[in-house]
Amino acid sequence: MAPSAASGVSSLPSGFAVFTTFPDLLFIFEFVFGGLVWILVSSSHVPIPLIQGWVMFASVFCFVATTVLAFLYVIGAHGNRTSWITLDAAYHCVASLFYFGASVLEALAAIQLQDGFLYKYYHENISAVVFSYVATLLYVVHAVFSLIRWKSS
């Protein structure tokens, strides 16, 4: 058995070290860009409710879950248990998939807005697409480094 697994010591930070260690400092950027996606999609015109419904679900779910997970890390709720490393890796993999699907669907919705809608709504949706892909990239990077941390635990 690996020494860290045998002793139950986790490499997850707690307290404000969450915001200074990589990949956990990505929580801040996931929070910001996820919030921007949520705000932009909710303020724009909805040409295809089913598509943008999934985008809203994915962005709100990831926004809330990221906020809760970051808060739990800050208060040290993981208690140095290695199961939290697994939770972190699993969550960020799922969030990456959710956001990738949401990004593709939001791009489709933006294409539908290109003709026949106000230019303002088109720009809001294009901005949502860009921020959604940035959020996807952040979640993928966090997932990769969380999987590396999980593998070494």
From Swiss-Prot:
Residues 18-151 form the MARVEL domain. Residues 1-24, 76-92, 148-153 are cytoplasmic. The keyword Membrane applies. GO terms for cellular component: membrane; plasma membrane. GO terms for molecular function: structural constituent of myelin sheath. The chain crosses the membrane at residues 25-46, 54-75, 93-114, 126-147. It holds the Pfam family MARVEL. Its main location: membrane. It is found in: Membrane; Cell membrane. Residues 47-53, 115-125 are extracellular. Lipoprotein. Keywords: Cell membrane, Lipoprotein, Membrane, Transmembrane, Transmembrane helix. May be involved in vesicular trafficking from the Golgi apparatus to the cell membrane. Plays a role in the maintenance of the myelin sheath, and in axon-glia and glia-glia interactions. Interacts with PLP1. PANTHER family: MARVEL-CONTAINING POTENTIAL LIPID RAFT-ASSOCIATED PROTEIN, MYELIN AND LYMPHOCYTE PROTEIN. This is Myelin and lymphocyte protein. It comes from Bos taurus (Bovine). The gene is MAL.
